[in-house]
């Protein structure tokens, strides 16, 4: 596809199968786990496996493949086993992505576990200040994902994300993945034209739109400021279709990857349904309208 719309794809049977799966459902971009997302240790692909993955990527004609780190990682954890395992796992993620040729990693910033926001952010920054120099061959970008703010999770405010980026020794290596479900659940209302303009103006002021490098497009089963992360099919949750219409017609984000993480079925049916829903929201506009960056 010519657009930058896609979905998270399974790596069952080998990561090399993911590009064709994405192509089959009509993706222009895809996201993958590079290992089992619920295990600490993952297998490093051989040179041959990595070459096959890159060949399949090219054959599928995808603009980009983005990696998502495993869910177990918590770089905000205090010193101890979880932090040690998290550092090792993220380092391995960077190494795998280097071998595979993937230059973008999405990650959840972490949870402070009751030690406070400031302490958690400091620990995240300290972790990255160790990790970036440890894997110099990874020259890509790490995307901090906006979170719903469940429990003690960090990343549910733009201020927190800005503090993490500014607090590292390598701010140029970091950007943001904007998850629509998470951000809405965290209290940012972009379901109206006015709200949409306000939220992205605030993002631009605190972080910069140049650092918005990926969207996770998900509707939400829960309401505004619920602090609960529950994804729903596009247009069938509490967000509704309007914010997705705004995003799909915002020229500032035309070439920013937009990845579905909506519920899966037994086959490709739901991914195809959600991709079609989003593409139907794109409207034909005049040249004058295309110069207007925000929804009317």
Curated annotation (Swiss-Prot):
SMART domains: AP2Ec
Taxonomic lineage from the root: Bacteria, Pseudomonadati, Thermodesulfobacteriota, Desulfuromonadia, Geobacterales
Protein name per its UniProtKB record: Probable endonuclease 4
Family indicated by similarity: Belongs to the AP endonuclease 2 family.
GO term, biological process aspect, one: base-excision repair
Gene3D superfamilies on file: Divalent-metal-dependent TIM barrel enzymes
Required cofactor names: Zn(2+)
Reactions that this protein is recorded to catalyse: Endonucleolytic cleavage to 5'-phosphooligonucleotide end-products
HAMAP family in UniProt: Nfo
Single annotated GO MF: DNA binding
Binding, Zn(2+) 1: 68, 108, 145
Gene name per UniProt: nfo
Domain of life per record: Bacteria
Species of provenance: Geobacter sulfurreducens (strain ATCC 51573 / DSM 12127 / PCA)
EC number(s) stated in the UniProt entry for this protein: 3.1.21.2
Function in brief: Endonuclease IV plays a role in DNA repair. It cleaves phosphodiester bonds at apurinic or apyrimidinic (AP) sites, generating a 3'-hydroxyl group and a 5'-terminal sugar phosphate.
Keywords, ordered alphabetically: DNA damage, DNA repair, Endonuclease, Hydrolase, Metal-binding, Nuclease, Zinc
Cofactor binding remark: Binds 3 Zn(2+) ions.
Sequence positions that bind Zn(2+) 3: 182, 229, 231
Record: residues binding Zn(2+) 2: 145, 179, 216, 261
One Pfam family from the record: AP_endonuc_2
């Amino acid at each position: 596809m010519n657009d930058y719309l896609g979905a998270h794809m399974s790596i069952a049977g080998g990561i090399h199968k993911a590009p064709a799966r994405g192509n089959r459902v009509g993706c222009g971009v895809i996201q993958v786990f590079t290992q089992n997302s619920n295990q600490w240790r993952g297998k490093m692909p051989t040179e041959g496996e990595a070459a096959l993955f890159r060949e399949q990527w090219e054959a599928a004609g995808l603009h980009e493949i983005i990696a998502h780190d495993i869910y177990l990682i918590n770089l905000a954890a205090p010193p101890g086993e979880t932090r040690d395992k998290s550092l090792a796992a993220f380092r391995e993620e960077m190494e795998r992505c280097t071998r595979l040729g993937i230059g973008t990693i999405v990650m959840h910033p972490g949870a402070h576990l009751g030690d406070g926001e400031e302490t958690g952010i400091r620990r995240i920054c300290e972790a990255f200040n160790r990790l970036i120099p440890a894997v110099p061959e990874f020259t890509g970008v790490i995307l901090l994902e906006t979170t719903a703010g469940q429990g003690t999770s960090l990343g549910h405010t733009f201020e927190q994300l800005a503090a993490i980026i500014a607090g590292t020794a390598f701010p140029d290596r970091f950007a943001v993945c904007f998850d629509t479900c998470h951000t809405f659940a965290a209290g940012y209302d972009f379901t109206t034209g006015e709200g949409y303009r306000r939220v992205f103006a605030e993002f631009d002021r605190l972080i910069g739109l140049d650092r918005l490098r990926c969207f996770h497009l998900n509707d939400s089963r829960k309401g505004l400021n619920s602090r609960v992360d529950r994804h729903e099919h596009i247009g069938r949750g509490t967000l509704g279709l309007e914010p997705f219409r705004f995003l799909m017609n915002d020229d500032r984000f035309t070439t920013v990857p937009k990845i579905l993480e909506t519920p899966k079925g037994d086959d490709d049916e739901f991914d195809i349904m959600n991709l079609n829903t989003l593409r139907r929201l794109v409207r034909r506009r005049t040249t004058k309208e295309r110069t207007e960056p925000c929804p009317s």
